[in-house]
């Protein structure tokens, strides 16, 4: 059906008379609160948003920040903006001060015509507008509750494949958020890539609790399900985080065949299980895409062992690799097979599967720009239709990141900043270049250290590792969060010793250990540890340190 269509708006228009289910939103995270939209409902509500925004002056090419809570309103606003040929800019609502600062940075960067937001954030919107006065940016604030369905209908804009579809801001784990310019062709191409990965399934049902502002939650579920034509069950990430078991209950209730989640969500799901799980059935799952953060073999094995009695098939687990700069998906394990692993010096590395035929992936020495032989670690470079047009208003950075060239070759590549290697046609990701720790001549990946820390004691839930200059060498620093808000001196000492012993035995390097209360370590909006920000805070003595 979609072979001759050029944009996701064309796809929605083609499905606009269908009464098949498109989106099922669980308002409180349970089936009892579901609200269903057919494709016809989705198209109609999107058209209402388009008409309303048009009456407020939004035109083709206008940038519109979408900071709406996860809901069907968000979906209607997203497709309504796209119908106008305008450019949606997904953004987390500014619930807390950290999110308000990020929100301000994004608005300052993209200078939108309008901001669509829930009325519950009116105070934050006022603060934002006051901040923007001095820089002459005056966005129109549009509260979703004020939607006027009486506005004159508009004809959907005609967009070309190369037109800008949306601006996806990166999570900013190693710096300030950057706006990735995703074209309509990028979106359609990545949907086709994922279709090849999944294959046809007339009975497919999806489920996502991921934030709809994140590339995996937006492109990998909301847009993808519309493109492929299967129903998608949605719940707020807040409801998942409050009770991760709701995810498993929804899989059971709706006989879900495809879902997605980062590594940490598998741990959360396992911890949500209890002795009585007879009400849970995961046998319908055929595809479980795991990505968005480093994938740990021990996490996968633990999840598989704990969910096997619930009917989970281990071949459904699909470790994958992607990023906003490539729209989303680059590589993933083939369906129906068990994922591969490789024993490395610092632990087991999980394969992210084969690279899709649409992409070309090369492993390159980041200093010499020369290709590296198979099996050796280097920077991952990507080329293909799904690679985005660049960063919004950052020409120099776009040239550096999106127009890299391998020594002796003419084609341009995307420099991902990720380290990895190829083996037997499969991609293995080992870490980030900026985060690599070099101590006493050894290369150490921080995520491996962080995993060792969390394994050291059940009271530790999150850790961050980085290096700082020492006397003639780099010092390995570990900051670990305990589950408690207050920690006694004796408990401090016990946890510190456990962490130091675990890290030293695994990596041969004795770390400086600092135990802190929960919610101390900075994270991105998608839950990734912000290592460079944590390092900056540590050096500025802004992180509470363990007493000497």
Where are these regions (language model features)?
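Conserved pre-ATP/AMP-binding loop-to-beta segment of ANL
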Residues: 19-21, 142, 150-169, 175-176, ...
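Gly/Ser/Thr-rich phosphate-binding loop
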Residues: 256-260, 272-346, 360, 369
């Amino acid at each position: 059906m979609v072979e001759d269509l050029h944009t996701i708006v064309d796809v929605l228009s083609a499905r606009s008379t269908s009464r098949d289910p498109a989106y099922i939103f669980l308002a409180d995270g349970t089936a009892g609160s579901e609200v269903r939209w057919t494709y016809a409902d989705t198209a109609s509500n999107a058209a209402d948003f388009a008409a309303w925004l048009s009456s407020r002056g939004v035109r083709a090419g206008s940038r519109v920040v979408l900071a709406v809570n996860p809901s069907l309103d968000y979906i209607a606003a997203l497709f309504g903006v796209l119908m106008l040929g305008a450019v949606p800019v997904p953004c987390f609502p500014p619930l807390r001060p950290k999110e308000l600062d990020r929100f301000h940075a994004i608005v300052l960067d993209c200078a939108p015509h309008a901001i669509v937001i829930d009325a519950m954030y009116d105070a934050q919107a006022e603060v934002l507008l006051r901040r923007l006065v001095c820089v002459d940016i005056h966005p129109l604030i549009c509260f979703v509750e004020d939607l006027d369905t009486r506005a004159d209908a508009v004809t959907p804009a005609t967009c070309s494949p190369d037109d800008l579809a949306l601006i996806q801001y990166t999570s900013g784990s190693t710096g300030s958020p950057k706006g990735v310019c995703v074209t309509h062709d990028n979106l359609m191409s990545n949907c086709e890539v994922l279709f090849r990965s999944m294959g046809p399934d007339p009975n497919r049902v999806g489920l996502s609790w991921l934030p709809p502002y994140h590339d995996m939650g937006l492109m990998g579920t909301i847009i993808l399900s519309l493109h492929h034509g299967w129903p998608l069950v949605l719940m707020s990430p807040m409801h998942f985080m409050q009770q991760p078991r709701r995810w498993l209950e929804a899989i059971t209730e709706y006989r879900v065949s495809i879902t997605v989640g980062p590594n940490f969500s598998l741990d959360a799901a396992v911890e949500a299980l209890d002795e009585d799980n007879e009400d849970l059935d995961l046998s319908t799952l055929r595809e479980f895409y795991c990505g968005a953060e480093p994938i740990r073999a021990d996490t996968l094995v633990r999840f598989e062992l704990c969910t096997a009695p619930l009917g989970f098939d281990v071949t459904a687990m699909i470790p994958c690799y992607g990023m906003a700069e490539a729209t989303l998906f680059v590589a993933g394990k083939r369906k129906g097979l068990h994922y591969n692993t490789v024993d490395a010096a610092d632990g087991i590395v999980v394969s992210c599967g084969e690279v899709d035929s649409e992409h070309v992936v090369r492993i390159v020495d980041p200093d010499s720009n020369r290709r590296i032989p198979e099996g050796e670690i280097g920077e991952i470079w990507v080329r293909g239709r799904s690679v985005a047009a660049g960063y919004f208003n950052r020409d120099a950075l776009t040239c550096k990141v999106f127009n890299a060239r391998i020594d002796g070759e003419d084609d341009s590549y995307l420099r991902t900043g990720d380290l990895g290697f190829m083996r037997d046609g499969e991609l293995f990701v080992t870490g980030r270049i900026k985060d690599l720790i070099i101590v006493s001549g050894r290369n150490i990946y921080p995520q491996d250290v962080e995993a060792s820390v969390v394994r050291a004691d059940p009271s530790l839930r999150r850790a961050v590792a980085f290096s700082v200059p020492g006397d003639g060498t780099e010092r390995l620093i570990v900051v670990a969060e305990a589950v408690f808000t207050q920690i006694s001196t004796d408990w401090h000492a016990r946890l510190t010793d456990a962490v130091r012993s675990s890290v030293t035995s695994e990596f041969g390097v004795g770390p400086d250990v600092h135990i802190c209360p929960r919610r101390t370590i900075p994270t991105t909006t998608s839950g990734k540890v912000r290592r460079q920000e944590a390092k900056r805070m540590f050096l500025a003595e802004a992180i509470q340190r363990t007493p000497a």
